[in-house]
Amino acid sequence: MDKIIITDLRATGIIGVKSPERDQPQTLLINITLFTDLKPAGLSDVIGDTVSYSTVSKSVLARVAETQFYTLEALADDLARMLLSRFCINAVTIRIEKPEFVANTSRVGVEIFREAVADNY
């Protein structure tokens, strides 16, 4: 399966359980892998035959800004469901990380994989 990869998309949103986390937006790093057939775009060289990186990125940034989840897991699942419903993709991997959130780490996070058919999205 072919992949479209978006790496280290910097999103800002309210996420977390404790008060300091919910008081102001935090920066999140989001990595997205979209599984889809890229052969039509490869043969035609037409942007309409593929998934727009820009549109995906803008959709994710807007969704993170407008939602307020307690867990990264819930945000990741929400983003996966949104992408699977809006774009012509077979599956998606979402990795979300909080930079410098836990002492002595550069970042912590979660990664999920969801399929359109198997997960009924």
Regions found by a protein language model. Give the residues of each.
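N-terminal, polar/charged subdomain of small-to-medium soluble alpha/beta proteins
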Residues: 1-121
